[in-house]
């Protein structure tokens, strides 16, 4: 099994409800088991339109390959009502990103892992550091906590809820 980290976000409608739905659908899929889930954070939009985002990071174990996992994330986004074709920067009901896939570095047209901008985004690094501050970014060789320490304190990232998702009960999902 591979340990992967997934970014979850959304800034349209019932943001928490949409992320809970996405996570519930995700952990019901064969080959994905939720290990841990960060707190739920509210963040100002960065390079996106619409209202403030709710963001979280899920640590999962998966037997899926990186391409399969990315496809699954897209299927879950679609099941939650996100259109397949969308403009960069538009408001998002649900946005699921593959941040890290073990220690693999993947550079393909449709898949870049680690996520190419994760080290620049507080809304990714704050919840990721909550889960594992000593986690090392495979491409940069730097701990997540150190990456976070070198970023500006803006935009603000604030905790909305520590225990927020009913899908935590699904942490027992079997790959």
Language model regions located:
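Extreme N-terminal starter segment of soluble prokaryotic enzymes
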Residues: 1-6
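Conserved beta-strand segments that form the floor/walls of ligand-binding pockets within enzyme
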Residues: 7, 36, 59, 95, ...
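A short secondary-structure junction motif
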Residues: 10-12, 46
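Residue-level signal for inorganic ion chemistry
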Residues: 11, 37, 127
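Short N-terminal binding/cap micro-motifs at the start of the first secondary-structure element
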Residues: 14-16
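Hydrophobic side chains in well-ordered alpha-helices
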Residues: 18, 22, 69-72
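Short, surface-exposed acidic-centric catalytic microdomains
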Residues: 21, 25-66
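Flexible, gly/pro- and Lys/Arg-enriched active-site loops
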Residues: 45-53, 64-70, 74-175
């Amino acid at each position: 099994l591979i340990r992967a980290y997934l970014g979850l976000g959304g800034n349209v409608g019932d943001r928490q409800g949409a992320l809970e739905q996405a996570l519930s659908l995700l952990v019901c899929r064969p080959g994905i088991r939720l290990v841990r889930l960060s707190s739920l954070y509210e963040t100002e939009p960065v390079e996106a339109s619409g209202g403030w985002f709710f963001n979280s990071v899920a640590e999962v174990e998966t037997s899926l390959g990186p391409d399969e996992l990315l496809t699954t994330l897209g299927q879950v986004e679609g099941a939650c009502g996100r259109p397949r074709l969308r403009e960069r920067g538009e408001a998002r009901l649900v946005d699921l990103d593959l941040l890290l896939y073990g220690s693999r570095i993947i550079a393909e047209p449709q898949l870049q892992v680690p996520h190419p901008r994760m080290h620049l985004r507080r809304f990714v690094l704050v919840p990721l550091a909550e889960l594992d501050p000593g986690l090392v970014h495979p491409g940069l060789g730097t701990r997540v906590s150190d990456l976070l320490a070198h970023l500006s304190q803006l935009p603000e990232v604030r905790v909305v809820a520590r225990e927020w998702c009913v899908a935590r009960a699904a942490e027992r999902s079997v790959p």
